[in-house]
């Protein structure tokens, strides 16, 4: 049952309204739910991908009843996709609530970038408001880039397509990919992801039977452009899989690594002696979650190519932004924390344009 929207919105403005472009937590649904508004809604979904959205009003009784379930959903799913909320009682949000034809509270939708053009698409949720039903809706409805390999022809096509890219393959006793696997394919969209039900019986096309027991499922592995294969040997959770993707691709093709992990986030790349034990302070990583930190061994081929291609001087650390096509080298001897603070307030000096052929030079 929906609480019907009054003809006129109340004049009371939510005291936790967000500044356009700044994403904060929801005052109603808690710290794992992101509060959006008319100004930043489209930009957020275009940048972050498929997002669960609840359109609500603070005074709505049914919305209040939804809070514990939605908080649990956000707690369990926020690492897989954004869980968000829009306060339709705020005047500033009339446009987005009208655009998505919100006629009652709470209205729940999965919103995602359209495959055609720059618009957004959405799928309505019409089930009960139990955790199990909502979780199933997200898992079933989320679009993904996973190719389902159920025949020899589909598998051969997947192998032949994008021959210069590392390919991620999961062979499973299940018949369809999990929400975790789908979300990873969206997050790392430059990598081809595939899913093979064991019943399809076409895994021999990847020539892996000499390396693993193909009856011991699930099997997650990466086929690299150089015909090398990396096998995953941990539990199938997000952090372990991401670490596997990063380390495997970094070791095989650093330019592909940058294109995959430094295209959406800026990267902080540090070049150190191989036996150095001075890593990145964990508190710095937590303070700058939008940065991706990379460590390279000094005198390695990749490090030497980067030093030859970029004008780093005596610097051993630099910020690389493929999206903006520039880099900024940390002054020699300056503490990393202070340098990052300088960047944050635009006091780190001018950035330098990246060479157009950077990725081809550091393969």
Curated annotation (Swiss-Prot):
One of its GO terms (biological process) is protein folding in endoplasmic reticulum. GO terms for molecular function: protein disulfide isomerase activity; protein-disulfide reductase activity. It is found in: Mitochondrion. Pfam families: Thioredoxin. The keyword Mitochondrion applies. Residues 1-24 form a transit peptide. This is Thioredoxin domain-containing protein C13F5.05, mitochondrial. InterPro entries: Thioredoxin-like_sf (IPR036249), Thioredoxin_CS (IPR017937), Thioredoxin_domain (IPR013766). Residues 32-141 form the Thioredoxin domain. One of its GO terms (cellular component) is endoplasmic reticulum lumen.
